[in-house]
Amino acid sequence: MVLENKTFDEERALYGSSGITVRNCRFDGPQDGESALKESKEITVENSFFNLRYPFWHDDYLSIKNCELTELCRAALWYTGHADISDSKLHGIKALRECHDINISGCSIVSPEFGWSVNNASFVNSSAESEYFMMRSSNLKFENFRLNGKYSFQYVENMEMANCDLNTKDAFWHSKNVTVRDSVINGEYLAWYSDHLTLINCTIKGTQPFCYCTNLKLINCKMIDTDLAFEKSEVEAEITTEIDSIKNPKRGKITLPRAKELIITEDCSQCEIIQAELTTA
């Protein structure tokens, strides 16, 4: 069944639907009804406008294309699985939570607290403005993705990122098994308490990165305007730029052209720091 060029504003307007296509429709109006497509399955939604709360809860096998979910469309997708979302605006707070098997491409996300406790999700050619983005989520992939917002990727597990641009703060805290390639990360206090974080061909900017880390690896990375790095961390790092300062690394090996300052106030004998410019001088 195809529903086309209609407006819905009543409570649970299409509750429990199965196998329908919604095209060029509006979910808006004076009745201000919630949960339009709750408990639905095998749904396709195209070129539609959502200005009401909680439209996609407990859904399964959902396709959303060229749609706008406004800032009044709060908590749009919760407890939903197998959803493909493309070329859409997700602009309501807490737009994605407790979901699984989600694919997002070509989307604009403006949504604080987006993506909490999500399992198995991919993001391609998309952008987000969000605080606490993807907290406690797992099995994630990001490619050609741009983020603006504090406290991102905290407590995430099993994540891969490539060609991303992250402007953030306190990112990757307590994360586990994360690999980031060919990306720029701009933000202070990066990746504290992380475990098995690997960065390859990345640029890192900001004060006090990588403190209290375990199994941290940096391969062919630039560190710009970074000071007080690696405090209390277990690290294997190959850095191609000089660092403002390194402080009390716990264990491992750090290779770099030069550190402007080494702050060693504790026993750091288990961490080797090789400064190439000093070695060849």
Q: What is the predicted role of each segment?
A:
Residues 1-281:
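Long, distal/terminal scaffolding or interaction modules
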